[in-house]
């Protein structure tokens, strides 16, 4: 099992007003999880609270050492919610719960290739 992550950051076209304050940008990570058979699972970690960014960053670095699914699953319960969601989504895709052959993921639209991750992340 191999976990990769890539940081993203972009300004919102319009500020987003929430009960916790105003968001002018989104920051987070794209997760790419690959099993030993080459199957992929994708997730996104984008905490709304700024203080959660540092926690997610530290936890993601620790998860780089995880070499088994069991280690990743054990990390879910102690992780910040945004990280647990992103990792859970990647694991669910590996399990065929989303993006199954009966209902495959569509190809990324051309503008998505302009994201900082580019072809290297999607290949």
Please report, for each region that a protein language model flagged, where it lies by residue.
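N-terminal capping/lid subdomain adjacent to the active-site entrance of alpha/beta enzymes
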Residues: 1-123
